[in-house]
A protein has these predicted regions:
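N-terminal membrane topogenic signal
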Residues: 16-30
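Ferredoxin-reductase
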Residues: 196-286, 335-337, 348, 363-365
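Membrane-helix interface/capping segments
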Residues: 65-78
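Terminal, non-globular segments
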Residues: 49-52, 58
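Short, hydrophobic transmembrane alpha-helix segments
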Residues: 38-48
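Juxtamembrane/interface segments at transmembrane-helix termini
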Residues: 71, 136-140, 192-202
Length: 416
């Protein structure tokens, strides 16, 4: 389950160089875009290098928001794509403000200046709204974000009206600016007008709903065709039922066989509360595709799993799909009181049938918070963690200090 607020994803390997190398293609893509922009503007119109960088950065912001599989692969995770997306958006604002002040106010033709001012006002407003996002309903927040596209169009008008023939005759500068502008426009158009219509090819309906405890439901979905995913991944789910917002929300897959999928959802926000209280069997749903790089199957033979509360779902998915465990696994599941724990019977039964599955249940009310100061982590193990971000950061430091050779992968979600 992915908690509703801002989206955060972290995959941390204790070998920092390996971690960097896994995202190298994405990092190179961003750096190369900026370097090419700097070199091209310096060679032709160096006085406009700052707004040129702002235009490239804005174009990249739209491109990174498309959730394209290629970008997720380049950055080794959708969450890291979003982190860079936020960076390019913020950088764009800084560059535009600097451009405005350095020029003594936007100048050129009166209309061109007005387009530029409109773009900056909208961008700054969106940034302020983004910081106030937790106080705004998600659907309203999503629609307000679309104003960025309008500001981007105003900004393009401003650039082309100011630059005139330098961008309207074929040369390296016009090719660079035109290419990034076109990619940004296409990306924004896809996000706003096409993604919701063509980006969800898996169509199905809810076939069963099960209350697991006082605030958690398991949703069973049957799809018209198999959904390709691996244990540990998540998907964006749209629910077509009166009273539900039309926007997709991400949830971890907690099991299934391709056409039948399970999602476990905790009541922790407006949308998830609506799911817990009002979702009905028979409602239509759609999915886009599988995301995520916390893929348990790719880990080493010795593994340590660590989970907190509702974030057990990626591990439940693996357990359901692998009744016979072929790895050596130590699983630490932390929860606050058994009434808040999930799938305890399934875990105990799995441990009984698989002697290489070592189960540790940690009730923080009785046992205190889970820590690894006195617990041993096998030297060459892969450690998977999925839980509250504060818990994972604390445990990551403890494990890193104890065993620098461990491969540590953790995933945490918040989504606005």
């Amino acid at each position: 389950m992915i908690k509703c607020n801002k989206f955060i994803y972290n995959k941390l390997n204790l070998n920092e160089m390996e971690f960097f190398m896994k995202s190298l293609k994405g990092i190179f893509f961003i750096i190369a875009s900026f370097v090419l922009t700097i070199l091209t503007w310096m060679d032709t119109s160096p006085q406009f290098m700052i707004p040129g960088l702002a235009l490239t950065s804005l174009s990249l912001t739209f491109i990174l928001a498309t959730r394209l599989p290629l970008l997720e692969s380049w950055f080794h995770g959708l969450g890291k794509v979003y982190i860079v997306h936020k960076f390019t958006a913020f950088l764009s604002i800084i560059l535009l403000i600097f451009h405005n002040f350095s020029m003594g106010g936007l100048w050129g033709s009166r209309l061109a200046a007005q387009f530029g001012n409109l773009a900056i006002y909208i961008f700054v407003s969106i940034i302020l709204i983004a910081y106030l996002g937790k106080y705004i309903q998600y659907e309203a927040w999503r629609w307000i974000h679309r104003l960025v596209y309008l500001a981007y169009i105003f900004g393009l008008f401003h650039v082309y009206m100011i630059m005139g023939n330098r961008l309207l005759t074929f040369n390296l500068l016009s090719f660079l600016v035109g290419s990034y502008a076109l990619l940004g426009l296409l990306a924004g158009f896809y996000i706003i007008f096409l993604y919701q219509k063509i980006g969800f090819p898996y169509i199905g309906k809810i076939t069963n709903l099960k209350r697991l405890n006082h605030d958690t439901r398991e949703i069973q979905i049957h799809l018209g065709r198999p959904f390709n995913y691996q244990s540990g991944q998540f998907a964006f789910l749209k629910i077509f039922q009166e009273g539900f917002e039309s926007a997709p929300h991400p949830f971890s897959v907690s099991g299934g066989n391709g056409q039948t999928l399970y999602f476990t959802v905790k009541n922790s926000g407006d949308h998830t509360k609506n799911i817990y209280d009002n979702l009905q069997v028979g409602s239509k749903v759609t999915l886009d595709r599988a995301y995520g790089h916390m893929i348990i199957e790719e880990g080493r033979e010795n593994q340590v799993w660590i989970s907190g509360g509702i974030r057990i779902t990626p591990f439940i998915s693996y357990i359901r799909e692998h009744p016979i465990l072929d790895k050596q696994v130590r699983f630490y599941y932390s929860f606050r009181g058994e009434e808040n724990a999930l799938y305890l019977d399934l875990l105990r039964d799995y441990a009984q049938k698989n002697p290489n599955f070592e189960l540790h249940l940690v009730d923080s009310r009785k046992d205190g918070y889970l820590n690894f100061e006195q617990k041993e982590v096998p030297e060459h193990a892969t450690v998977y963690m999925c839980g509250p971000l504060s818990m994972m950061k604390s445990l990551a430091k403890q494990i890193k200090k104890q065993n620098p050779k461990a491969e540590l992968i953790y995933e945490g979600f918040k989504f606005k």
